[in-house]
Amino acid sequence: MNTFGREFRITTFGESHGKAVGVVVDGVPAGLPLSEEDVKRELERRMFCHIPVLNPRCEPEEFEILSGVKEGRTQGTPIAIVIWNRKVISSYYEELWLKPRPGHADLAYYLKYGINYDHRGGGRASGRTTAAIVAAGAVAKAVLRHVGVEVLGHVVELGGVEISATYTVDDVRKSWEKPLPVVDDAALEKMVEKIREAVLRGDSIGGGVEVWALGVPPGLGEPHFGKIKADLAKAAFSIPGVVAFEWGAGRALAKMFGSEANDPITVVNGRPALATNRAGGLLGGITVGAPLYFRAWFKPTPSVRKPQQTVDLGKMEPTTLEFKGRYDVTIVPKALVALEAITAVVLADHVLRAGIIRRDRPISGSLV
């Protein structure tokens, strides 16, 4: 399926080397402030063009908002955003037509669709398609700003190098002023060295990120299959390359006694609140007013220059593949922006489901 969400719904489309990728966002109330600059800002955060090995394609992200927005405000109708694919070199992929790349979706798509799929640049399974999710996230973040919710993230691991410094939310915000959004300067230096090493080896590296949501009102989420973390886990695994997901203190809780794992409950400003937040802002999958946070990990980019064993599907015999096209030495920084975006989409959906914002009422501009 290419559609996600219940009240705030997104439908993405497009392939890596097609004319464009894009998204249709439905469920946005009328009167919400939304500009092209909002979308441009999020798309540019994803690019990392100042580090060419992280984004050798580095497209300028030419996009258009085709519908649903007029004079800087939403119309309450579907918002269609198209992002044109410009820097496409499909010749690299001619020899890959019948040689599926190990670790990529090529083999799975061949087994499911036969020859009826676009393999160039990874096609529908490419990280390029996350540009559409980031555009949808720009709309979702506009919805969340209206209710005081902020979504932000940072890199916590890259190429086996993990951050070790303690940090605050403000440190996470400031990390985006660095070459990579990493709060720990010593770890950042080692991560850059790992990137250089991978480039010299003709290889790639994976890593992990952490995403926070601040100002989330209590009461979002529903029992069992409507839990916030269930929806966010599904959303996270929809981002290409995600291999693991951890909510709150995650695995560390499994090593504690219950008395250590539980967050004490106290009173803040006359309301019950968590004294600590090992639970990641959720109890029973429902928000309690504390910050939400989770971590996700990405495998190394499957496309590498080192020779790899595969199969020639035309001859049905083993062969060796040496990839000659452009590839990202790591997708982690760009994928972080996509994870922020899909987190915003999930939370915007739950804000609408809870009735905090009504789809059938304009946010502003009403004459009655």
Curated annotation (Swiss-Prot):
- Enumerate the Gene3D superfamilies for this protein: Chorismate synthase AroC
A GO term, aspect molecular function: chorismate synthase activity
Catalytic activity reads: 5-O-(1-carboxyvinyl)-3-phosphoshikimate = chorismate + phosphate
Cofactor annotation remark = Reduced FMN (FMNH(2)).
List cellular component terms (GO).
Answer: cytosol
Which residues make up the binding site for FMN? R124, A125, S126, G284, K299, P300, T301, P302, S303, R326
State its cofactor: FMNH2
**Which InterPro entries does the entry mention?**
Chorismate_synth, Chorismate_synth_AroC_sf, Chorismate_synthase_CS
- Please state the pathway this protein functions in, per its UniProt record: Metabolic intermediate biosynthesis; chorismate biosynthesis; chorismate from D-erythrose 4-phosphate and phosphoenolpyruvate: step 7/7
Cite the PANTHER family for this sequence: CHORISMATE SYNTHASE
Query: How is this protein named in the record?
Result: Chorismate synthase
Q: Which organism is it from?
A: Pyrobaculum calidifontis (strain DSM 21063 / JCM 11548 / VA1)
